Structures are given as C-alpha cells and as structure tokens.
C-alpha cells in the first residue's frame, strides 16, 4: 500500500499529454527564448531568426503564450498602447524597443497566427535561455543528445515487447553530433558538481587518479585545480579526447589522456579510478568487466570510486531506469546491486560519501 494520491481522469489526461512536452522542445530547439531576449518581435521577425515558417511558428507561439512561457499582444493592443503611450511588458529602459511597441500581459493569447502583434519572453520561458543558470534548453534540444533520449521513448512499446530496443544508443554508437552534445551536457553537470566532489573526500591521499569515461575532462579539471599535486589521466573515446585536451589547456592543468574503447584498452596503474555515471550504462557483465579492469590496475591500497545516483527517491530512480531501458543499454542499480557487481569483480565497499551536489560516491577496495 502507498499514501500517494490516486490519479483521476483529468490527472491521467494531463500526464499523458504530448502537446506541451513537444511544443517546449521545439521552442528550445529553435532557441525562441534567446531570439526574444533583447525584446519583443513579430511572428515574421521571430520566424526569420529561427528559420521557421511564420504562420506555423505563430500558431506554436500562440499555444506557448497560453501556457505562460511567452507573452503577446494583438495588433489592436499594439495600436491602443501606441495611442496611450503606456508601455507593455519588456518596454522599460534598456529594453531596446520603441515606445508603444511593447507587449501587454492582458493579451496573453491575443496574437492571431501570422498577425503583426509581438511576442516577448515570459518569466516561465527564461528557463529556455541558453547558458542561463538552471537552463534546460540543451537537455530539451531535439537536435542534441536530449532529443536522442526523447525520441527513444517513442519505441517504448516495441522495447517492452521485445525486452530491448532494436538498436542500442550508447555513446560508442552515437553520431558525432549526438556524442558531442552528450559530452557538452555531461561537462556542464560535472562543472556544477565538481567542487562538491573535490570537498567530500581527501584527494590528497592519492598520487594518480584515472577518470574512466570522464568525457571532456571537466571533473578532472575540478580535482586537479583543487589538488595541484595530483596527477590525472583521462580515459575516453578519441573524439572526446580532442576536446578534453583543449579544455585542459584552457584551464591551465596538465593531464594525461588515453583514447579508445575501455574494454579494449590496458589501463594505466593508479591508486584511484573514478567511474562517474558510467556503470549504469552497462549491463551487469560489462559492469563487472569494467570494475575488474580497474582492480587489476590498482596500486597497493588503491580504490575504485563509483559515482552513481542514489535510489533514495523511487520516482526518479524508476524514471532513470526506464530511460536506460529505451536507450538499449545498462540499468539503474540499488546500493546492494552495486555491491554485488563489485564483489563479482573482486572488490568490496569500504565507504560511502554524500557530496552536497551530485551523485553519491561508493569507495571499493580489494
């Protein structure tokens, strides 16, 4: 039994609606919030910036205005505001628009598709601004890795019937564009979580840290910056290594690199191996193999640090596990399941660390 509320028909309809999720993703992909960041635009002007059809974009915007992500004014409101001299939303000092050309809140859905009224960025739409703190735009971009994940769910029926998708979507199989988008998303997360990881345990006890599957090196940059005496090596696919070397140079840190497929490489010896959001990408046999390769390369008294999300929030845990299913590889695991996988690789858990941001850290030793 559970004390969670039982969804009614209206709740189910809202939960199953695909219009809002797709409309938001199209807005993110077309960068509509960024195009409106400097002030209101007509549908024609916005369409020109977004490389979209003005009439179709106007209809999309009318929906997003009704949902509160953007603001609008009709042609009639434009004339009324121009006559009265009263500014609308976004028309104050520094807004970069002429008097009388602002956007009124009273006409949220007042723009006819293809009309000459203006659209402006609403408060809710600011989460779609690229680069803004907490921005979701890159995750929602249908042309990036976020879109790759989203589209995979349209194959959920076949996946559930067959036990897995027709084609796996791990990083090795991604297109260069999708793989680059994935690296960028993971780097943003690593930069945000890196300081907390550097503080949660004493990295000065290590001489050499190897980050296995560390993307473009954002996590290693955080560690090597906080602990200058630490030596680091990044193990990644060759395309990611190229970007990582540029990032290391820009950050002014010295870091070794080893490019190739983890399962085909001989890992360098080190006293700490870091696997961040990596094992959940593997089924159990591959996870055991990855951990065993790290164990064999450990210096005496070394450890393997597994960074994976906690299963403390069931809804989030279940969502991520379903995502791994439709992507065709890996699974989320409970603490006990990670311990079992580690044991099969000849490792046992020594400690758990809980950073103030990011995944928990599981320390495994021989």
Question: Which ranges hold each PLM region?
Answer:
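Alpha-helical subdomain
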Residues: 1-81, 203, 208, 212-366
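Conserved Class I S-adenosyl-L-methionine-dependent methyltransferase catalytic core
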Residues: 14-27, 34-35, 49, 55-80, ...
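Intrinsically disordered, low-complexity terminal tails and inter-domain linkers enriched
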Residues: 73-116
